[in-house]
């Protein structure tokens, strides 16, 4: 079995990605009026980092970024949601493996694939796993946490669907397309 090393580029991406995740999570959110539930731009950025650098980078960026954001905002981390940020980053990374953004192409078919995957991933993470962990870890009332989870899932689907798709398209457009250079 071949040992896979983590590249310096991936470690740097995790560090920078986590820092940007914290900044977006602290300062670029839109309150919804429902407790501890916001429209988050950080998950669209997490989708970009995960799609470019893979599932491990997405996992670590989500875990580290969310934990630091919680510690700097509330004084402690809400671990059930920190774990889910890592899971969603990993899932975005798996979705991104098929996108091949470095080829310079992000077609309509790729957009549909990405958005179908992120919808399923957000529902699983935020509407199912996060509330269940809230109940198991913190003994929170089920009706409250499942309501928060569904609202968060819907808001993240919208945020990642719009902002994340724009970021992925912009990144792919910045890459040199294979076969685009010609000898004169």
UniProtKB/Swiss-Prot annotation:
Location of the protein in the cell: Cell membrane
GO CC list: plasma membrane
Keywords associated with the record: Cell membrane, Membrane, Transmembrane, Transmembrane helix
Protein family according to the UniProt entry: Belongs to the UPF0397 family.
Coiled coil: none
Listed transmembrane segments: 11-31, 44-64, 77-97, 117-137, 148-168
Pfam family, one: ECF-ribofla_trS
Organism this protein belongs to: Staphylococcus aureus (strain MRSA252)
UniProt-listed InterPro entries: ECF_substrate-spec-like (IPR009825), UPF0397 (IPR022914)
Name by which UniProt lists this protein: UPF0397 protein SAR2767
Bilayer topology term: Multi-pass membrane protein
């Amino acid at each position: 079995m071949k040992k896979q090393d983590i590249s310096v580029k991936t470690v740097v991406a995790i560090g920078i990605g986590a820092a940007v995740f914290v900044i977006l999570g602290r300062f670029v959110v839109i309150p919804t009026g429902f407790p501890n539930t916001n429209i988050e731009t950080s998950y669209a950025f997490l989708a970009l980092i995960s799609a470019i650098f893979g599932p491990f980078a997405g996992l670590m960026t989500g875990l580290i970024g969310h934990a630091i954001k919680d510690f700097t905002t509330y004084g402690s981390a809400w671990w059930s949601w920190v774990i889910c940020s890592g899971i969603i980053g990993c899932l975005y990374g798996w979705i991104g493996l098929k996108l091949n953004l470095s080829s310079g192409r992000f077609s309509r078919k790729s957009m549909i694939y990405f958005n179908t995957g992120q919808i399923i991933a957000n529902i699983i993470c935020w509407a199912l796993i996060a509330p269940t962990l809230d109940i198991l870890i913190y003994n929170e009332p089920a009706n409250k946490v499942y309501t928060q989870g569904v609202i968060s899932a819907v808001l993240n689907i919208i945020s990642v669907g719009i902002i994340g798709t724009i970021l992925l398209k912009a990144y792919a457009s910045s890459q040199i397309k294979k076969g685009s250079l010609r000898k004169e």
